[in-house]
Curated annotation (Swiss-Prot):
Gene Ontology biological-process annotations: protein homotetramerization
Taxonomic classification: Bacteria, Pseudomonadati, Pseudomonadota, Gammaproteobacteria, Moraxellales
Subunit structure: Homotetramer.
Classification via InterPro entries: Ald_DH/histidinol_DH (IPR016161), Ald_DH_C (IPR016163), Ald_DH_CS_CYS (IPR016160), Ald_DH_CS_GLU (IPR029510), Ald_DH_N (IPR016162), Aldehyde_DH_dom (IPR015590)
Role description: Aldehyde dehydrogenase that shows activity toward n-alkanals (C(4) to C(14)), with a preference for longer carbon chains. The best substrate is tetradecanal.
Family membership noted in the UniProt record: Belongs to the aldehyde dehydrogenase family.
Protein name: Long-chain-aldehyde dehydrogenase
Gene3D superfamilies (UniProt xref): Aldehyde Dehydrogenase, Chain A, domain 1, Aldehyde Dehydrogenase, Chain A, domain 2
GO MF annotation terms: long-chain fatty aldehyde dehydrogenase (NAD+) activity
Residues where NAD(+) binds: G218, Y219, G220, A221, E222, V223, G224
Catalytic activity: a long-chain fatty aldehyde + NAD(+) + H2O = a long-chain fatty acid + NADH + 2 H(+)
Temperature behavior of the protein's activity: Optimum temperature is 43 degrees Celsius.
C-alpha cells in the first residue's frame, strides 16, 4: 500500500501553511513574529512554516505553566490517570493520520510509524496512567509513638527537549510520566521535526487544563538554552547528542536541579559461534538482529552499529548476513513495503556520507552500500552500508547515526567483552547465543544500560532504558520514572504527649 502524499486528495493529513506555539492552552504566534520553513526529508521540499521562537516565548510558556501548576500539582492520581487514558484514546483514534504525518516530517518508513512509533507512544500514556493509580507512599514506624510518612509530590514545572529521530514517541516517553506525576511541562521539539507533537497537541488540547502542556518551537541556542538555563524549571530532560548533553548538565548545575540525559551510543551486537549450529528459525532471527542497524535509517541512539562476530563462523555468517541486508528495500517512506526511508535532514545525510568517506580513507573495507541514493525528488536517502575493519577505526568509535554498520571479529568470550566495552558509550548492546549461560554472562559483563539478549530494538513501556558512561544520566520508561519527576516529602510525626527530655 502506498499512502497519498500530504495535502493531496485522499491523503490522511493536510498540513496547515503555518503552525504556532502552544502556550496556556492557546495557539500563540512567536513574540518576534519570525518563522522558518519546515522541510520534509522525503522530497526535500518545505511543507509548512514553524515559529522561530526566542527566550521571550519561553518566558510566556513558563508563566502559563506556573499558573497551571497551582491546581495541577494538587490534582488527584485518578484525575491524571483518566486524562492520560483519554490522550491515548484520542491518539489511537487518529493513528493513521499521526503515522503519515510523522513519516513526512521525519522521513522514516510508514510501516514503522504505523506499527511502532505511534502505538508505542499510545501505550506509554496508558502504562503511566496505570502506574500513577498503583503508586503508594510509605509509612515507617520509628517507635510506638513516632511515625515517618513518605509522600510523593510533583516537582512543579519541568522542561523537556525532544530529539528528531522519534519525535512523537520521545515526547511521549517524557510527557507521560511527567504529567502522571503531576507536573506542568514546557517542551521544546527538535527544529528538524516539530510538527508531530503539534498535531498531538491539536488532538488533545480540549482534554488538558490550560498551561499543563506548553510547546515552544525554535532552534537550540535560541530556545533550548533559555529553557535549560531557566531558574523557573525544577528539572530538565534531554535526548540528543553527548556534546549537547554535556552543556545541558552544566546548565542544570547552575540551578541545582535534577537532569535526565539520554545521549549517544555505539552499541555492540555480539554474535557467538553457536548461532550457526543449526539452519533454523533462531538463525533467521539472528540474521534479522544483524540487519537491525538499518532500522529507522540507523537514526537510533541504540543502533547496533558495531557487529562483533566470532572468528570461527565469520565467513559463513557474513555471507548470510550480507544477503539478508541486500533484501532491505530502500524507497518512498509512504510505501508500506519500504524498509528504509529518508534520513531526517540534509545536514544529517551529509554528515553520514562524510563518515562513510572517513571509513574508506582509514582503510575500512566496504562490503555493501556506501552511497547516497536518489529516491523521491531531492530527498535524503542513503544505502545501508557495511564496513569491515577493527575497533580502533573512527567508524567503530564515533556515533554516525545512520544506516552504517562496522563489522569485526573476536576469538573468544573475553575478547568479545573487551571489544564491546572499548567505547566511551554504554547505552545499548545485543548478545546472540543459543547458550543461556553464555548470553547471561555476556549481558552482565557488557557495560550498557540495556542489553538485548537474542533480540534487538524492543522498547516496551515497562522496561527501564538509559545509559552507562557518556550515554547519559538517569533512566526513562518503567514505573521508576515517576520517582524521577517527583520529590519525596517526609512527614515525621510524634503522637506522644510527653516532652523528649532534652531541655
Amino acid at each position: 500500500m502506498h499512502y497519498v502524499d500530504p495535502n493531496q486528495s485522499g491523503s490522511k493529513i493536510h498540513f496547515k501553511d503555518q503552525y504556532e506555539n502552544f502556550i496556556g492552552g492557546q495557539w500563540v504566534a512567536p513574540v518576534k513574529g519570525v518563522y522558518f520553513d519546515n522541510i520534509s526529508p522525503v522530497d526535500g521540499k518545505s511543507f509548512t512554516r514553524i515559529p522561530r521562537s526566542s527566550a521571550e516565548d519561553i518566558e510566556l510558556a513558563l508563566d502559563a505553566a506556573h499558573k497551571a501548576k497551582k491546581e495541577w500539582n494538587k490534582s488527584s492520581p485518578t484525575t491524571r490517570s483518566n486524562l492520560l487514558l483519554k490522550i491515548a484514546d484520542r491518539m489511537e483514534a487518529n493513528l493513521e493520520m499521526l503515522a503519515v504525518a510523522e513519516t513526512w516530517d521525519n522521513g522514516k518508513p510508514v510501516r514503522e510509524t504505523l506499527a511502532a512509533d505511534i502505538p508505542l507512544a499510545i501505550d506509554h500514556f496508558r502504562y503511566f496512567a496505570g502506574c500513577i493509580r498503583a503508586q503508594e507512599g510509605g509509612i515507617s514506624e520509628i517507635d510506638e509513638d513516632t511515625i515517618a510518612y513518605h509522600f510523593h509530590e510533583p516537582l512543579g514545572v519541568v522542561g523537556q527537549i525532544i530529539p528528531w529521530n522519534f519525535p512523537i514517541l520521545m515526547a511521549a516517553w517524557k510527557l507521560a510520566p511527567a504529567l502522571a506525576a503531576g507536573n506542568c511541562v514546557v517542551i521544546k521539539p527538535a527544529e528538524q521535526t516539530p510538527v508531530g507533537i503539534l498535531l498531538v497537541a491539536e488532538l488533545i488540547q480540549d482534554l488538558l487544563p490550560a498551561g499543563v502542556l506548553n510547546i515552544v518551537n525554535g532552534y537550540g541556542a535560541e530556545v533550548g538554552r533559555p529553557l535549560a538555563t531557566s531558574p523557573r524549571i525544577a528539572k530538565i530532560a534531554f535526548t540528543g547528542s553527548t556534546q549537547v548533553g554535556q552543556l545541558i548538565m552544566q546548565y542544570a548545575t547552575e540551578n541545582i536541579i535534577p537532569v535526565t540525559l539520554e545521549l549517544g551510543g555505539k552499541s555492540p551486537n555480539v554474535f557467538f559461534a553457536d548461532v550457526m549450529d543449526h539452519d533454523d528459525d533462531f538463525l533467521d532471527k539472528t540474521l534479522e538482529g544483524f540487519a537491525m542497524f538499518a532500522l529507522n535509517q540507523g537514526e537510533v541512539c541504540t543502533c547496533p552499529s558495531r557487529a562483533l562476530i566470532q572468528e570461527s563462523i565469520a565467513d559463513q555468517f557474513m555471507e548470510k548476513a550480507i544477503e539478508r541486508v541486500k533484501r532491505i528495500k530502500l524507497g518512498h517512506p509512504l510505501d508500506t513495503d519500504t524498509m528504509v526511508g529518508a534520513q531526517a535532514s540534509l545536514e544529517q545525510q551529509e554528515k553520514i556520507l562524510r563518515c562513510i568517506d572517513t571509513g574508506r580513507q582509514e582503510g575500512a573495507e566496504v562490503l555493501l552500500g556506501g552511497h547516497g541514493r536518489q529516491e523521491v525528488g531531492n530527498g535524503y536517502y542513503i544505502e545501508p552500508t557495511i564496513f569491515k575493519g577493527h575497533n580502533n577505526m573512527q567508524v567503530f568509535q564515533e556515533e554516525i547515526f545512520g544506516p552504517v554498520l562496522s563489522v569485526t571479529t573476536f576469538k573468544d568470550f573475553d575478547e568479545a567483552i573487551q571489544i564491546a566495552n572499548d567505547t566511551m558509550y554504554g547505552l545499548g548492546a545485543g548478545v546472540w547465543s543459543r547458550s543461556t549461560h553464555t548470553a547471561y554472562r555476556a549481558g552482565r559483563a557488557i557495560e550498557a544500560g540495556r542489553v538485548w539478549t537474542n533480540c534487538y530494538h524492543i522498547y516496551p513501556a515497562h522496561a527501564a532504558f538509559g545509559g552507562y558512561k557518556k550515554s547519559g544520566v538517569g533512566r526513562e520508561n518503567h514505573k521508576m520514572m515517576l520517582d524521577h519527576y517527583q520529590q519525596t516529602k517526609n512527614l515525621l510525626v510524634s503522637y506522644s504527649t510527653k516532652a523528649m527530655g532534652f531541655f
